[in-house]
């Protein structure tokens, strides 16, 4: 019995030791003023299949914030990624028909910043300069 307990405890501790912190991402894009109400309306009632796909792709604590700066609207997305292969999960999401349908609705609302647009992307990356756990 003691040996079984030790084996179980060792397995449990090993599982805890390999658990990694989520990788945090913050992305930014512009929001077209004439489409802001539509964008907010879409996100007030997102497609359930899209939310499921986000979770299947190991994304948690996902939020999008809106901010006006110098008369222009911007969106800031925060998410935590808990998977092992971000690129593969993003390809999986991009291949999902319901997500594609969703993006056909949301993409026209967004105004990519020049650096993101040059890469054919909607959202641009940001650099973390401080983190307090």
Please state what every model-predicted region is.
Residues 14-15:
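C-terminal motif of bacterial Sec signal peptides marking the signal peptidase cleavage site
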Residues 29-31, 78-81:
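Short beta-strand-to-loop capping motifs
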Residues 22-36:
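Terminal, regulation- and interaction-focused segments at domain boundaries
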Residues 65-69:
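Short beta-strand micro-motifs enriched in acidic
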Residues 53-60, 80-123:
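An amphipathic, aromatic/His-enriched active-site/gating alpha helix that lines ligand/cofactor pockets
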Residues 35-60:
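Short amphipathic alpha-helical segments
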Residues 18-19:
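Residues lining hydrophobic/aromatic ligand-binding pockets adjacent to catalytic sites
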Residues 1-4:
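Positively charged n-region of N-terminal signal peptides that target proteins for export
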């Amino acid at each position: 019995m003691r040996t079984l307990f030790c084996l179980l405890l060792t397995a449990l501790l090993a599982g805890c030791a390999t658990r990694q912190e989520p990788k945090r991402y913050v992305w930014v894009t512009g929001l077209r003023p004439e489409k802001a109400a539509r964008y907010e309306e879409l996100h007030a009632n997102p497609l359930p299949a899209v939310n499921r796909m986000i979770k299947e792709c190991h994304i948690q604590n996902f939020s999008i914030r809106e901010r006006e700066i110098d008369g222009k609207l911007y969106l800031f997305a925060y998410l935590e990624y808990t998977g092992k292969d971000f690129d593969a999960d993003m390809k999986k999401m991009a291949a999902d028909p319901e997500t594609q349908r969703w993006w056909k609705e949301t993409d026209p609302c967004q105004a990519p910043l020049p650096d993101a647009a040059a890469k054919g992307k909607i959202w641009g990356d940001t650099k973390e300069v401080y983190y307090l756990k």
